[in-house]
Amino acid sequence: PPFFFNDTATTETYTLSLHDALPIYDAITGVKNVTRSDDAWAVDPLLPESMRVDNSWHTNDGFDRGHLCASDDRSFSTEANKQTFYFSNMSPQLNSFNGGYWVTFEQLLNSWVRKDNAFGSVYDKIYVAKGGTLDKLLIDYKGTKAGGDGVMPATDSKGFTSKGLPVPQYYFIAVLAHRANQPVDIATSYQTIGFWVEHRDDYGYTFEHPLNRDDTKANAISIDELESKTGIDFFCNLPDYIEDEVESSYNLTDWAW
């Protein structure tokens, strides 16, 4: 799939890089003004033509076009919502995982940033990095449940779909929250949490009967552990003395489930 290996490309609402996208939630992005633009799939204009993926890469392969940055996370404007349907934001996901398991994490994160609830009113900014592992792929995978297109999903000996897209074995989420009206230069103003989620089709959940939010706690880990698993230095713009402290541990009771 297309990535910038030695550079990044950034717009007002998203960043393209080798490893991750960094959706930023604040007083602007945490509001909901528009609804999802279903099936508004589009090529990302920031990508060089040689790196672009279009819809033909995502059809008749048994996998969903799974959002990394969720559509509902970019509902403050029509343009921002359309950007979530760029193929640079899509990852091949098993149908039951996308619609019944991963969606619960999307809904959980979304609930944290809404200003009309107790948790969202405490934090003025929440930073989220999401992605799939490209060094750990679903190799020689043979699905037992057909995808939304009616095709049985499968990958080759390298972990690629029939159309040539890599299928992550794990998905990850890193979250950093900053308390409103608190100094930006002290560690107690921040809290972090990570999630490490195995990509499987046997969780037994559906869109109508998704994972209970409380059960997402089983996937929670510290940012330090997530960095060890992914090789990514999350939230590296924090001063080291803050980063070292807030990434070393997490407290489940600090978050609203």
Regions found by a protein language model. Give the residues of each.
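A short, polar/proline- and glycine-enriched secondary-structure boundary/capping micro-motif
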Residues: 30-36, 204-209
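Active-site acidic/histidine clusters and adjacent loop/turn architecture
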Residues: 21-25, 31-39
